[in-house]
Amino acid sequence: MERRNFAALCAAVLCFWLFALAFGTAQGMGLHLVARREAETASAQAVWVEPALPAAAAPALSLICRAALLIEQDSGRVLYEKNAEEKMPIASITKVMTLLLTFEAIHDGRLTLDTLVPVSEHAYHMGGSQIWLEPGEQFTLDEMLRAICVSSANDAAVAVAELVGGSEPAFVEQMNARAAQLGMEQTTFRNACGLDTEGHLSTARDVAIMSREILTHCPEVLRYSGIWTDSLRNGQTQLVNTNKLLKRYSGITGLKTGTTSGAGVCISASATRDGLKLIAVILGAPSSADRFNAATTLLDYGFGAYEAAPLPALPSQPLQLAVKGSAEGSVPLDYSALPETILLEKGAGGTLRGELTLPETLEAPVERGQAVGKVSVYQGENLLSEYEVRAAVDAAKLTLPDALHLLWESLTGVS
């Protein structure tokens, strides 16, 4: 009798396990949802792209420079381009990558703004724009970032590169590795500050990709690049921003200028108006006036032709989705990929609607960050953009020990 009872219990456990694998656990059949909401607004073709930046039709603009590119920051859509794939020196715009790696080191906990940055003989000997660092001097990382962003100091950039990478050559390797990760296929860095060096080349498109990355993931850079004047050494060293658009253009937020004999006069400028964020890249202008005039022309075109419209709200936005074959039963959903606004062409008219698509259930295993659904934005029947809905946590596949534990809980009430 006891043997038959034990066999029955084993059979029950096996059946419970198989049932759980086949049909899931707490959440049952899950859901299928397509949610829509319509709103009358302007519309235009807009495609979410990362990291490639596709070009839109645009009128010819009078720009005195070798290369130019205008993108909308949130979507990455190219609004205007001129010789955007031509490789050329980019001068101190190089420092955008130096700043990106530095802010990422801060985010990772390897550095703080109070970290002291020593000055080496190598950093001391940098030419070009500088704050005249002396070997053995120390400044906080916050002070060095101000020197880099406001005065474009080459000596400060190299000192920070040595702190982050151990040496400037090692840091340059990190710069090139990060560029490759971002899809900057035409870029090769040879130094951390942008001084003319053979083979130190990039393109307007790659500069836009790099600029978009730092503005999106390290927006604190604007607290530095938006400073007009500052000082170091208890007021003895004055810093004045090289980006004159800060005083001349409404909505300018900052970023980086650059000038060398090989690169000409350059800028990657960021600006925001009414929620629309633009990045204008100008390379190889013959003069500072031409650089700022070209950037102004690009930004004027962008703000005049486009707008940022609110993403259409969805009447229902489920917080979780059922999972079959997992002890978790369901996973919470992550909607963080959805932007607050969508790029639209001014005056185009039309109906903007959003559509959320999710499966009935998910099959275990599910990994955190896995795409499990999408939000599509349409103008009429024309698809404008798609954004991923992701799983917010892992959901491991149910194992026999998991099934035994769940059965024990159900029989005894003891977890």
What are these language model-derived features?
Residues 4, 184-188, 196-201, 205-415:
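Domain-terminus/edge residues, biased toward the C-terminal soluble/receptor-binding domains
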Residues 14-18, 28-30, 393, 404-408:
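An N-terminal domain-start capping segment
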Residues 2-6, 26-218:
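Active-site-adjacent loops and short helices of periplasmic peptidoglycan-processing enzymes
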Residues 23, 27, 35-36, 45, ...:
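Intrinsically disordered, low-complexity polar segments enriched in Ser/Thr/Pro and acidic
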Residues 4-27:
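Sec-dependent N-terminal signal peptides of Gram-positive bacterial secreted proteins and lipoproteins
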